[in-house]
Amino acid sequence: MKIAFFNPQGNFDKKDSHLTEHPDFGGQLIYVKELAKAMGKMGNKVDIITRKIIDKKWPEFSGDFDYYPDAENVRIVRIAFGGDKFLNKERLWDFLGEYVKNIYRFYQKEGFPDFVTTHYGDGGIAGAMFKKLTHIPYSFTAHSLGAQKKDKFKNAKDAEERYRFSIRISAEKVAMKYASFIVTSTQQEKEEQYSHNEYIDVYPEIKDKIFVIPPGVNTNIFYPDDTDEYKFSKLPIIVSSRLDPKKNIEFVIESFNKYLKDGFELIIVLRKKPEEYTGYERQLIEKAKKAKGKFLVITSQKELAKLYNSAAKHRGIFALTSHYEPFGLAIIEAMACKLPVISTRNGGPVEILDNGKYGHLVSTHEEFKEAALKIKDNYEKLSEESYKRVMEKYTWERCAKEYLNLIEKENVILPEFFEKQMG
């Protein structure tokens, strides 16, 4: 089967350039890449359709095609639209018609895909436009929905000017309506986000085609091994989120500073040297410095996995305390290395940790302290149970199989003997 992934924002290349360094290069890109690779390993031909960028600040994304060395069936296809320069996702809405028309022209030359998976509202509306042109069915995976983000802003006018919520939400509703099926990562996302008042006019007709398919973890990178390359003076608390207000790293710094400095050390992972950051990010770094936090510059997932394994050897903890976390891919990456987790009560982590069975959910500094001490006293048991949880429920192979089962219901799958006759 030939499957196209529509992901206009951010970009992809074999080096994972800029991954986690920019809001448009976050967990969604990891999701798309890993799901595409898992489908490719099952014999499907997969195209990730993104944007061609000719910009000195983003030199990695100027080629028409790119490939992953470990995924022979996966191709990155960059389509020109919206000019040459890099554009944040909020500015792409004006050019999605051009994106779709150029995808159509591209596939006219080499044959169209059997199915399209679309990602975020921009990919979703592109899938709907593409379906109108070709009648090729698509699925919609929002990753996050505009209504929930809109609710967090007090000044509606400023929020609309910056994030263009009216356009985003209208695109999401069309994507939902015409999708063959909709994928969410958690039950909470299915039940609460899609039933929001902004979507109430389409929810009754889409609710039965929403399926919960948890994402996976790359077990070729994140797995327990004997790595112990990092040394710690005390029990490490690891934070590896983007330095973004949404990730609420201040909460971890404050909890550590108030209660845990004697027995633990705080390690914050950065993508570049501390002095190279500015604005809010620099303020956060200075706050961590005052609390005696330490910093490690890590620029690859493989190196991050080494850190997690070393931290687990030293009875460490992984912390992710976002104000809201749609899923929590970083959590399962840590758990796959047997590194126990303290996380936010808001969003996907509640389901990953099964309401606290496989890790600790917190909302106050006191709860963070208690969680850290409980992990310390029950380390081996929680470490093993965390790992088993990931292996049983959160692999990309399982995620891909569930997608493909739904895709096959939308397509005529012929035996190879007859498929060849169709040319």
Curated annotation (Swiss-Prot):
Q: What is its EC number?
A: 2.4.1.14
GO MF annotations for this entry? sucrose-phosphate synthase activity
Catalytic activities = beta-D-fructose 6-phosphate + UDP-alpha-D-glucose = sucrose 6(F)-phosphate + UDP + H(+)
Q: Which InterPro entries match?
A: Glyco_trans_1, SPS, Sucrose_synth_GT-B1
Glycoprotein as a keyword of this entry, yes or no, is no
Top enzyme category = transferase
User: Which UniProt keyword terms apply here?
Assistant: Glycosyltransferase, Transferase
Instruction: Say if the entry is tagged with keyword Glycosyltransferase.
Output: yes
In Pfam terms, one family for this protein is: GT-B_Sucrose_synth
* Domain of life the protein comes from: Bacteria
Q: What does this protein do?
A: Plays a role in sucrose synthesis by catalyzing the first step of sucrose biosynthesis from UDP-glucose and fructose-6-phosphate.
Regarding protein family, the annotation reads: Belongs to the glycosyltransferase 1 family.
What is the designated name of this protein? Probable sucrose-phosphate synthase
Q: Which organism is it from?
A: Thermosipho melanesiensis (strain DSM 12029 / CIP 104789 / BI429)
